[in-house]
Amino acid sequence: MQSVINTVKGKALEVAEYLTPVLKESKFKETGVITPEEFLAAGDHLVHHCPTWQWSAGEESKIKPYLPNDKQFLMTKNVPCYKRCKQMEYSDEQEAIIEEDDGDGGWVDTFHHSLTGVTEAVKEITLETQDCGKTTSNIAVDDDDDDDEGEAADMEDYEESGLLDNDDATVDTSKIKEACKPKADLGGEDAILQTRTYDLYITYDKYYQTPRLWLFGYDEQRRPLTVENMYEDISQDHVKKTVTIENHPHLPPPPMCSVHPCRHAEVMKKIIETVAEGGGELGVHMYLLIFLKFVQAVIPTIEYDYTRHFTM
């Protein structure tokens, strides 16, 4: 039943997107949405710091006129996925419902309680230009702890954990790393047999005026995964609600998994406000870097490329 509802909603949104005018004036600071030009700037910034991500044109017949022909969307391919979500060690105590009154039951932040420290005032947020090929991250007041690598925090944790509210505290990502630790040694034969790969894409959604993530998976022999197979690699709290199956706007079938963008602008707006309260300013060019941390809560076992360090 939920799949039927999602299909109907998807068709309605296709029409709505077609009728929605292209956003021309920046409203990033006020509402968290971005223009196509701002999407391009954020995409260029991502490609510069994380070169496994690249711009792509897609099918000529599906080119969007408000984006350059050779920069229709971003993609990264052959991203490893070593374990299924059910093999991760987490419990209900680690979850928190975000926005309970949204009519859909709220957004479940699976590792909400894994972060144990926050920072008070932010003068600026800058990206450390370090190796982005590794999928570990540190969010800290400085970069003295280069050897202390842990899993990245997701975007909701920035706002819900009271990011930037306490004195001289460092976000401890080591607990997230421990929470996501597979039950079996990744070096074992069983782990190798279970390794999958994913192609990830980031498009600009004209209706929601935000980025949107798409993913499609393959097994060990590079054979396409079924929808049910891909659902095994997605947090079960998000399957068929936050994550739906839809056609990629720039590529031919088959349909792909997509992380619905209806909450992205709202969450980004809260982060912008939090940073501003600390005396800092969040540049729109950082959008996709934060976005990739945000969606990690939805696909925690897919080890895509994101920045290692944010200096607060």
Swiss-Prot record:
The N-terminal region works in concert with its geometry-selective amphipathic helix (AH) to promote LC3-PE conjugation activity only on the target membrane. GO terms for molecular function: Atg12 transferase activity; Atg8-family conjugating enzyme activity; Atg8-family ligase activity. Conjugated to ATG12 at Lys-241. ATG12-conjugation plays a role in regulation of mitochondrial homeostasis and cell death, while it is not involved in phosphatidylethanolamine-conjugation to ATG8-like proteins and autophagy. Its EC number is 2.3.2.-. The keyword Transit peptide does not apply. Residues 136-156 are annotated as: Disordered. It is an enzyme of class 2 (transferase). Homdimer. Interacts with ATG7; this interaction forms an E1-E2 complex that is essential for the transfer of GABARAP thioester from ATG7 to ATG3 and disrupts interaction with the E3 enzyme complex. Interacts with ATG12; this interaction is ATG7-dependent, essential for phosphatidylethanolamine (PE)-conjugated ATG8-like proteins formation and also mediates the autoconjugation of ATG12 on ATG3. Interacts with the E3 enzyme complex composed of 4 sets of ATG12-ATG5 and ATG16L1 (400 kDa); this interaction disrupts interaction with ATG7 and promotes ATG8-like proteins lipidation. This is Ubiquitin-like-conjugating enzyme ATG3. Signal peptide: none annotated. A motif (LIR motif) lies at residues 104-110. It comes from Xenopus tropicalis. Belongs to the ATG3 family. Keywords: Autophagy, Cytoplasm, Isopeptide bond, Protein transport, Transferase, Transport, Ubl conjugation, Ubl conjugation pathway.
